[in-house]
Curated annotation (Swiss-Prot):
Residues the UniProt record annotates as site (Stabilizes the basic form of H active site to accept a proton): D90
Main location: cytoplasm
Residues annotated as binding tRNA: Y14, F63, N65, N111
DNA damage in keyword set: no
Name recorded for this polypeptide: Peptidyl-tRNA hydrolase
CDD domains per UniProt: PTH (cd00462)
Higher taxonomy: Bacteria, Bacillati, Bacillota, Clostridia, Eubacteriales
Organism this protein belongs to: Desulfitobacterium hafniense (strain Y51)
Assigned EC number: 3.1.1.29
One GO CC term on file: cytoplasm
Length: 185
């Protein structure tokens, strides 16, 4: 069994924001696979089969800073080891249009990842970072991540979400090393 968790904030006012890149990717994946989310584990959960293995998709509804609670609840209930968890989230240190897949690491200042590390008790879980770029001069970082993507960024976002779907699907079916080799370019 595997878990793919996409981080974001619940509520319509956050739906199209940079900080919701994880939710956006999971929504696109669920749409592609014709899956429906249902409330469970302080989140919205969908399930599917990939590579002969059950895979849960999770969008925590706890707000970003407490995302780890929802991830831990689902992982504990289904006995999913951290090495079988992928967390998809926004990353300001990557330019928009870039992905980075990692098998472990620090939170890098991301509160959703800090929460996940604290709740799982380890840094050893997979992450797919979706680049959202840095704010331009005069923008506060918090305001930037909670702002919507610009009209100019939307085509790039669409392309990167498509690549992200392929990356998490390959991770679930064939493993992280293969996915990293293909998508960390």
């Amino acid at each position: 069994m595997k878990l793919i968790a996409g981080l974001g904030n619940p509520g319509g006012q956050y739906a199209e924001t940079r900080h919701n890149a994880g939710f956006l990717l999971l929504d696109c994946l669920a749409e592609e696979l014709k899956l429906d989310f249902r409330p469970k584990f302080q989140g919205l959960v969908a399930e599917t089969m990939m590579g002969g293995e059950k895979v849960y998709l999770l969008k925590p509804q706890t707000f970003m800073n407490l995302s780890g609670r929802s991830i831990r609840e689902l992982a504990q209930f289904y006995k999913i080891a951290p090495k079988d968890i992928m967390v998809v989230y926004d990353d300001m240190d990557l330019p928009i249009g870039r992905l980075r897949l990692r098998s472990s690491g620090s939170a890098g200042g991301h509160n959703g990842i800090k929460s996940t590390i604290a709740e799982l008790g380890t840094e050893d879980f997979w992450r797919l970072k979706v680049g959202i770029g840095r704010p331009t001069a005069g923008w506060d970082s918090a305001r930037y991540v909670l702002a919507s993507f610009t009209k100019e960024e939307l085509p790039v976002l669409e392309e990167i979400l498509d690549k992200g779907i392929k990356a998490v699907t390959l991770w679930a079916k064939e493993g992280g090393d293969k996915a990293m080799n293909l998508y960390n370019r």
